[in-house]
Amino acid sequence: MKKPIFILCLFLIIIGCSETKQAKPALDETSKETVMAESNESTFVYNESEAIWGFVIDTITGNEELTQLKPVEKEVLTGEMMEKIINKTWPRVQIKYLGTSNDTAFISIPDSEILTQQMGSAGADGFMVSTVYSFTEINGIKHVSFDFEAGDHASPGVYNRNSWDTNNY
């Protein structure tokens, strides 16, 4: 009776101590999402695939150049459509299109802290420039009036395509 119990215990010990060949995932799903979020942080701030205007690095000079990334049909473009495009392009800085008066589009940024405090000056400038250039693609729009709480990196006001020296990017 002792011999079968001894063999059974020995068998269980051997099985319990042997390595399994089943591959363990390197990261659990939560860790994967965190790593992806950290490695793709710029994707969450700026989504180039949705952008009409953006900055491209000139391979010869190494400078960033403001470039129209995709053509638009100005005849059918509306402020509401542009609001959706901007909000998809900049998911962490959500705008509200308020309306148009004469040649000015009016937008607000209810939660402007990311824009004014967290994106840095270059990120905030990139947002402001690309948003102005995108809105001024709409027929008749020459200016964009921004309403938001001022911060370290961006200020509200009325801007147009001449508000920045885009040759310095």
Would you name each region that the model predicts?
Residues 1-15:
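Sec-dependent bacterial lipoprotein signal peptides
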Residues 17-169:
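Bimodal "functional hotspot" detector
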